[in-house]
């Protein structure tokens, strides 16, 4: 059956529901996203390997994902703002989602120090000290002018102790409230490049179902534009990831888009869609393609192998 639910820009979500899989439309100021959808990762504003914004349109891409941390370091978010925001900077006119930078701070950066205010860390480029907290992340994303801004969160290492994961979830909730308040301030003062920028919150809790569920209940009350599941696909068994999604899904708002961060293998996407997820991203497709690894219905092939040099057959017989 079709259900239409409207709470304003970005929240119009038409869906057809069969079991937990959903078919929907997510409307934004930069266009409507047909879901389920995969976001192509353009970390610093371009897909590695030489793909242009025109190429993305040609292959039917709907959303481009750029990274707050990397763009802040180089070329600098203020420069991007001076050039009119990411859409003018990249010449991509569709929806753009910017990651908050939290994952990179906790995975790439060295010598980090976490406090209630935020995180102090050393740049992976030259080692200089940087501070980033909820307000700073929102300010950078306001300069970038993305369609969707992700809230600043703590992505704990896996495995992590239950007590630390619980404290981290509570801190991430407090940071989310600060993100929401800062975005409202930036819009009110006319500072944001995109006054219609949307905010997604991120569910954390490592691989502890009780923490995942409780955290989702907390952030679902904040009336955000969308909700993401973060901190998965970081080394835990695949079945554990699926179980965490299944545990959290009943507590995710039905009328809001759902995003599983960092997941992008065909099998993972199908399994997650069946569990009620709408949106995905991963560097794997473009990274694999650059190295000649191609997905087919029969599995992955390495097109650089000598046996394919004079092979005239279609790469995938099902697509021939």
Where are these regions (language model features)?
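Non-catalytic, usually N-terminal nucleic-acid engagement modules in DNA/RNA processing proteins
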Residues: 11-193, 305-311
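Glycine-rich phosphate/ribose-binding loops and adjacent secondary-structure elements
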Residues: 170-173, 182, 186-188, 194-315
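Cys/His-rich short segments
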Residues: 316-320
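Single conserved hydrophobic/aromatic residue that forms the stacking wall/gate
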Residues: 1-13
């Amino acid at each position: 059956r079709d259900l239409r639910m409207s709470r304003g820009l970005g929240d119009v979500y038409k869906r057809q529901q069969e079991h937990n899989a959903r078919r929907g439309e997510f409307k934004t100021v930069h266009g409507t996203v047909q879901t389920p959808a995969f976001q192509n990762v353009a970390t610093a504003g371009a897909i590695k390997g030489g793909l242009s914004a025109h190429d993305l349109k040609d292959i039917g891409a709907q959303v481009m994902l750029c990274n707050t941390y990397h763009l802040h370091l180089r070329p600098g978010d203020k420069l991007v703002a001076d050039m009119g925001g990411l859409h003018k900077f990249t010449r991509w006119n569709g929806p753009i989602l910017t990651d908050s930078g939290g994952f990179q701070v906790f995975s790439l950066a060295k010598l980090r120090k976490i406090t209630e205010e935020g995180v102090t860390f050393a740049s992976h480029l030259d080692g200089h000290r940087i501070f980033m907290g909820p307000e700073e992340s929102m300010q950078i994303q306001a300069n970038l002018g993305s369609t969707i801004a992700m809230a600043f969160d703590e992505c704990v290492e896996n495995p992590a102790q239950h007590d630390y994961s619980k404290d981290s979830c509570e801190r991430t909730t407090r940071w989310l409230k600060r993100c929401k308040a800062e975005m409202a301030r930036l819009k009110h003062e006319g500072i944001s490049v995109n006054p219609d920028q949307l905010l997604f919150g991120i569910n954390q809790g490592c691989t502890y179902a009780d923490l995942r569920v409780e955290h989702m209940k907390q952030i679902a009350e904040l009336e955000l534009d969308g909700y993401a599941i973060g901190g998965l696909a970081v080394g835990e068994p695949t079945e554990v990831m699926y179980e965490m999604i299944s545990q959290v899904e009943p507590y995710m708002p039905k009328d809001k888009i759902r995003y599983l961060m960092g997941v992008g293998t065909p099998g993972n996407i199908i399994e997650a869609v069946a569990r009620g997820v709408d949106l995905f991203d991963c560097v794997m497709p473009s990274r694999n393609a650059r190295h000649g690894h191609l997905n087919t219905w029969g599995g992955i092939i390495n097109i650089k192998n000598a046996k394919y040099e004079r092979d005239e057959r279609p790469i995938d017989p099902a697509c021939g």
